[in-house]
Amino acid sequence: MIRIGHGFDVHAFGGEGPIIIGGVAIPYEKGLLAHSDGDVALHALTDALLGAVALGDIGKLFPDTDMQYKGADSRGLLREAYTQVQAKGYKVGNVDVTIIAQAPKMRPHIDAMRAAIAEDLACDIEQVNVKATTSERLGFTGRGEGIACEAVALVVKS
């Protein structure tokens, strides 16, 4: 059996950088406002994986009202969520992540993001796709107010 999940996340810019996206620190003059480390890519991916096996979302598993997750490393959250996906008898078939940001440029960091995600999900890097786009200067991402991300995860019965 295969199942598909979709995830979305957004964080506004605020404070000082760097930012963490896809598990990779990216130099930037602005930071991202968040309860955890603000990694929109891993948050969207975590939601996609949890959704694929009907385990809710990242906020249910790691509530932002719980101080133990203040400043949390999103790679650790992703790994914990994936452990729960595996406990339901599923493993990653493939994942696809789309980062939406006017700046900073993501292309130089994509390979490192793919490697980090593949490591966290204990899968082959060929099962992980990460891409970036802009919103052509439209909306909050186009105005440089924040970053958004969508992710899709296909999981297969182990």
Curated annotation (Swiss-Prot):
<dbReference type="GO" id="GO:0019288">
    <property type="term" value="P:isopentenyl diphosphate biosynthetic process, methylerythritol 4-phosphate pathway"/>
</dbReference>
<feature type="site" description="Transition state stabilizer">
    <location>
        <position position="35"/>
    </location>
</feature>
<feature type="site" description="Transition state stabilizer">
    <location>
        <position position="134"/>
    </location>
</feature>
<dbReference type="GO" id="GO:0016114">
    <property type="term" value="P:terpenoid biosynthetic process"/>
</dbReference>
<keyword id="KW-0479">Metal-binding</keyword>
<protein>
    <recommendedName>
        <fullName>2-C-methyl-D-erythritol 2,4-cyclodiphosphate synthase</fullName>
        <ecNumber>4.6.1.12</ecNumber>
    </recommendedName>
</protein>
<feature type="binding site">
    <location>
        <position position="143"/>
    </location>
    <ligand>
        <name>4-CDP-2-C-methyl-D-erythritol 2-phosphate</name>
    </ligand>
</feature>
<feature type="binding site">
    <location>
        <begin position="57"/>
        <end position="59"/>
    </location>
    <ligand>
        <name>4-CDP-2-C-methyl-D-erythritol 2-phosphate</name>
    </ligand>
</feature>
<feature type="binding site">
    <location>
        <begin position="35"/>
        <end position="36"/>
    </location>
    <ligand>
        <name>4-CDP-2-C-methyl-D-erythritol 2-phosphate</name>
    </ligand>
</feature>
<dbReference type="InterPro" id="IPR036571">
    <property type="entry name" value="MECDP_synthase_sf"/>
</dbReference>
<dbReference type="GO" id="GO:0046872">
    <property type="term" value="F:metal ion binding"/>
</dbReference>
<comment type="function">
    <text>Involved in the biosynthesis of isopentenyl diphosphate (IPP) and dimethylallyl diphosphate (DMAPP), two major building blocks of isoprenoid compounds. Catalyzes the conversion of 4-diphosphocytidyl-2-C-methyl-D-erythritol 2-phosphate (CDP-ME2P) to 2-C-methyl-D-erythritol 2,4-cyclodiphosphate (ME-CPP) with a corresponding release of cytidine 5-monophosphate (CMP).</text>
</comment>
<feature type="binding site">
    <location>
        <begin position="133"/>
        <end position="136"/>
    </location>
    <ligand>
        <name>4-CDP-2-C-methyl-D-erythritol 2-phosphate</name>
    </ligand>
</feature>
<feature type="binding site">
    <location>
        <position position="140"/>
    </location>
    <ligand>
        <name>4-CDP-2-C-methyl-D-erythritol 2-phosphate</name>
    </ligand>
</feature>
<comment type="similarity">
    <text>Belongs to the IspF family.</text>
</comment>
<comment type="pathway">
    <text>Isoprenoid biosynthesis; isopentenyl diphosphate biosynthesis via DXP pathway; isopentenyl diphosphate from 1-deoxy-D-xylulose 5-phosphate: step 4/6.</text>
</comment>
<dbReference type="GO" id="GO:0008685">
    <property type="term" value="F:2-C-methyl-D-erythritol 2,4-cyclodiphosphate synthase activity"/>
</dbReference>
<feature type="binding site">
    <location>
        <position position="43"/>
    </location>
    <ligand>
        <name>a divalent metal cation</name>
    </ligand>
</feature>
<dbReference type="Pfam" id="PF02542">
    <property type="entry name" value="YgbB"/>
</dbReference>
<keyword id="KW-0456">Lyase</keyword>
<comment type="subunit">
    <text>Homotrimer.</text>
</comment>
<feature type="binding site">
    <location>
        <begin position="9"/>
        <end position="11"/>
    </location>
    <ligand>
        <name>4-CDP-2-C-methyl-D-erythritol 2-phosphate</name>
    </ligand>
</feature>
<feature type="binding site">
    <location>
        <position position="11"/>
    </location>
    <ligand>
        <name>a divalent metal cation</name>
    </ligand>
</feature>
<dbReference type="InterPro" id="IPR003526">
    <property type="entry name" value="MECDP_synthase"/>
</dbReference>
<dbReference type="InterPro" id="IPR020555">
    <property type="entry name" value="MECDP_synthase_CS"/>
</dbReference>
<feature type="binding site">
    <location>
        <begin position="62"/>
        <end position="66"/>
    </location>
    <ligand>
        <name>4-CDP-2-C-methyl-D-erythritol 2-phosphate</name>
    </ligand>
</feature>
<keyword id="KW-0414">Isoprene biosynthesis</keyword>
<feature type="binding site">
    <location>
        <position position="9"/>
    </location>
    <ligand>
        <name>a divalent metal cation</name>
    </ligand>
</feature>
